[in-house]
């Protein structure tokens, strides 16, 4: 059974339901949170109960849809004093304020901004609340279905690109890859972005296939046999979520600390040939904002001559942002650094969460959620349409994504 970060029951467009997996409780407890309003969507995004740029956008859109559904219910209208439903224009004014509120939940991930821009266009084109609700339903369904399909295409594109490159340079045998944060089914509608590429590599290895031709591989054909996910402090998305997904899919993997990556590359019994990372926003020149620690990983990979790939959908590329210096970088609460939360060790019965302080309460903390990797350290950007590489001058040309 595949992992589901978002459960969207869509049989009847007037009676949809949305639940999101509380990822702060993983990997020990699987508990879903119902989403009924925009405020619910804001809360789970802001608290990082749901995370990953594609999933954030999807949950944001679904929270608008379910709020519209409730507004169509007269029992609910009576308690929603902040909406004026005397006219569609009055409703639209309030909805725009709600969308602006939702956008403030996570400012770095551009997918949410792009999705809410689409919602505003639907709001402008509709003439009634019920029509807007129906169009939101169609858009939400399309967004989820396209995300999964695009993720599979991205995964295959990334896997084929790496295997082709290894074959071209004459490499044969087993190899390993690195990844950071969580970019799999838990960060998307399904399959994943960077972790999707790793899934595709593992499928090639299991099937004994080379890329791009689906023929039986020789015993020495390149094949990925191991993954090294970084723990990804301070929220530990690598140790809590990516490790959980790799175990779920039975992909051979060994969890490593963020600080041990250079030594792991240096001593790995299986050569590490690539790092696959996701993105929360890609600037027009290819500079990439991703989970804090990504820049450090890129620098280490450059030192050791390891290919560094960014895997992200077209919606993550921001044509209005020229370079990484223009990307707003979210800073999180200092206590998210000072305190670690997890399952209580040695507890019997159902796992219980416990929080442990790991730094003095009055110690100043700098806790950025993201860093920005300059395009100079990125070998390729993998999208659902194709893989982008740099020209002879070392620059990406992403212009076709904006036409």
UniProtKB/Swiss-Prot annotation:
- Annotated positions for site Transition state stabilizer: 181
What is a single cellular component term in the Gene Ontology annotation?
cytoplasm
Kindly state which keywords UniProt assigns to this record, in alphabetical order: Amino-acid biosynthesis, Cytoplasm, Isomerase, Methionine biosynthesis, Nucleus
Q: Domain of life, per the record?
A: Eukaryota
Q: What compartments host this protein?
A: Cytoplasm; Nucleus
Q: Catalytic residues per the record?
A: 280 (proton donor)
Q: Which GO molecular function terms does the record list?
A: S-methyl-5-thioribose-1-phosphate isomerase activity
Question: What's the main place this protein lives?
Answer: cytoplasm
GO terms of biological process kind: L-methionine salvage from methylthioadenosine
InterPro entries given in the database record: IF-2B-related, IF-M1Pi, IF_2B-like_C, Initiation_fac_2B_a/b/d, M1Pi_N, NagB/RpiA_transferase-like
The record's similarity note reads: Belongs to the eIF-2B alpha/beta/delta subunits family. MtnA subfamily.
Q: What does this protein do?
A: Catalyzes the interconversion of methylthioribose-1-phosphate (MTR-1-P) into methylthioribulose-1-phosphate (MTRu-1-P).
The record, for HAMAP family, names: Salvage_MtnA (MF_01678)
Protein name in UniProt:
Methylthioribose-1-phosphate isomerase
Q: Which organism is it from?
A: Eremothecium gossypii (strain ATCC 10895 / CBS 109.51 / FGSC 9923 / NRRL Y-1056)
